[in-house]
Amino acid sequence: MLMVISPAKTLDYETPPVTHRFTQPQYLDHAQELIQQLRQLTPLQISELMKLSDKLAGLNAARYASWHPEFTPENAKQALLAFKGDVYTGLNAEDFGEDDFAFAQDHLRMLSGLYGVLRPLDLMQPYRLEMGTRLANARGKDLYAFWGERISQWLNEALAAQGDDVLLNLASNEYFGAVKRKALQARVIDTEFKDLKNGQYKIISFYAKKARGMMARYVIRERLRDPAGLKDFNAHGYYFSAEQSGPDQLVFLRDAPQD
């Protein structure tokens, strides 16, 4: 079983990594093509394109200028440890052991507007480029056109390498939109996490993002390979709802937050 999650806007390059193992991103030639285009934008153009403050636009213009494809532990960090946000709070990889990282490296992928697909231990230099950014490029009008079917092909290769055909979607719609389902040679299992609010179960963004990270953590820590075991997920008060679920749509409910 292979999982996909979204990246995060918030990055942490200050905290020392808890593992010294690392790998190199597999698709840097594509990332470099995007970087070369981003370098042509002024901070004002970046601000308008990405709807960023002047300060953040300036920061990312500097990031694009200093980005170069020779990644080392001195100028980059493992992607799973560099991303910070609700999903990664739930995943909490900071307390992983080496065996956890090894399993994650085989069974987890992070989708990225710049890097396409990242493995957990892939070194990553800091950036800001959300998948939904309408960055016109040589391949089309936006990043979905830029990546085309490549991300699906790379996920197929990862699945083939582990001899499996199940893809667990823990990514947002924005990011999973870059995955062409028809090109996948896999059964896709979607997930929903709902919390009780005002008498109804609803998807609350903050909690749902964190729950997606907790589900990824559960799969990694339990070394889960059979999707049937996903129904046993019960972290922080969530429980499987057979009534609201379908064969490839797993719904988890929670009656009260526990965090």
From Swiss-Prot:
Positions of disulphide bridges: none
This chain belongs to which protein, by name? UPF0246 protein PA3539
Protein family according to the UniProt entry: Belongs to the UPF0246 family.
GO biological process terms held by the UniProt record:
response to hydroperoxide
One Pfam family per UniProt: H2O2_YaaD
PANTHER family linked: PEROXIDE STRESS RESISTANCE PROTEIN YAAA, PEROXIDE STRESS RESPONSE PROTEIN YAAA
Gene Ontology cellular component terms for the protein in this record: cytosol
Q: Which InterPro entries match?
A: YaaA (IPR005583)
HAMAP family, alphabetized: UPF0246
